[in-house]
Amino acid sequence: MGKQEVRTRSGERVAIVAGLRTPFARQSTEFGQVPAVDLGKMVVQEMMARTAIDPKLIEQVVFGQVVQMPEAPNIAREIVLGTGMSINTDAYSVTRACATSFQAAVNVAESIMAGSIDIGIAGGADSSSVLPIGVSKKLAASLLALSKTKTVGQKLKLLSNLSFKDLMPVPPAVAEYSTGLSMGQTAEQMAKSYAISRAEQDALAHRSHTLAAQAWTEGKIRDEVMTAFPEPYKKWLDMDNNIRMDSKLESYAKLRPAFDRQYGSVTAANSTPLTDGAAAIMLMREGKAKELGLEIMGYIRSYAFAAIGVEKDMLMGPSYATPIALDRAGITLNDLTLIDMHEAFAAQTLANLKMFASDKFAQEQLGRAQAIGEVDMSKFNVLGGSLAYGHPFAATGARMITQTLRELKRRGGGLALNTACAAGGLGAAMILEVE
């Protein structure tokens, strides 16, 4: 596979000049009444203020939301209209499940590469608290028919056909539409298929919380997380509220399995919680960033997406996308300074790490002569991961990009991998570079 050039036709690189996120909050806590669109506006507004850039210079916004709200289907355009940008700023929304803001970043990068724009914003927001609660199909059909009736008798006849069950609200589905399998069930299957023990999963979760707590304590995360003042402005949140600041390994063993009560090993403690939050990054043509006198955080070196089956191993996307991104960057796993993998579940993370190092997997599934290699854990998720920070679906990619670039900078530069699994058997990988 050939090397990928993430550059404009004149040879300029795609630079990331800013990155910011809200604190991530567990479902029904501080952001319990804040819709995703407001979280998105909040973070983009603050990022532009910190960058001190004229909002009218932003030419494109690509934003994502996984849990869609019918009243605001194009979250990107709502963000443009609600943050002081020019009304002529192009804006559209994307969704790639848990890899949504990676897709948003790539879309903006490709617009810059094509010469269509110089400056764009990418990101994502999700609320697991403010949800689109639906109605049954029978009630929906009856309500539609009701609007066309003319007499009271006709209305009563329609309503009399409804049962109590038909009137019950329908929450958003948590299972795959095509298979009926939930993410947790797939994580449980992967734990069993790849012989990943409960102890290994709990140890990874403990590691994630411990490293995230340490990162916050040492001030490494502070500047990339804004203080949020959600309506009605009576309280604020300036830190992620899912992190166990005093994580103890023995406490993880106390939880019961969540998806296979009898033989399972996936628990609430070694899985990401439902989370509310938003994150955004600002991308520019390299020359434009220098012209404006902005400090460049880093560059996108390459990216790749992959799609696999959903009946089994649905969360193995990183193992398929990462080799492609490495090839396109012209590097190997050993060339990386940092590796950051989205931790949807400890089981999924550990299964992917095993497949990174498996020659059998590489030969049989990827058609490669050998594995990309074993991950050096001293480079892996060094500030903790999604198990600790939480996972507002569409925001996680932008969180990872910002967090990784800042950590690379602290280490004097280098190359890093960001990779994530996603619903529908999707995978994303991105190589980032800091000079």
Curated annotation (Swiss-Prot):
Q: Which gene encodes it?
A: fadI
Entry-linked CDD domains:
thiolase
Task: List cellular component terms (GO).
Answer: cytosol
Location in the cell reads: Cytoplasm
Tell me the SUPFAM superfamilies matching this sequence. Thiolase-like
Name of the molecule in the record: 3-ketoacyl-CoA thiolase
Q: Which organism is it from?
A: Vibrio cholerae serotype O1 (strain ATCC 39541 / Classical Ogawa 395 / O395)
- Enzymatic reactions: an acyl-CoA + acetyl-CoA = a 3-oxoacyl-CoA + CoA
Enzyme class, first EC level, given as a word: transferase
What does the record give as EC number?
Answer: 2.3.1.16
- Subunit relationships: Heterotetramer of two alpha chains (FadJ) and two beta chains (FadI).
Q: What does this protein do?
A: Catalyzes the final step of fatty acid oxidation in which acetyl-CoA is released and the CoA ester of a fatty acid two carbons shorter is formed.
The family this protein is said to belong to: Belongs to the thiolase-like superfamily. Thiolase family.
What does the record give under GO molecular function?
acetyl-CoA C-acyltransferase activity
Identify one Pfam family in the record.
Thiolase_N
Q: Where are the transmembrane segments?
A: none
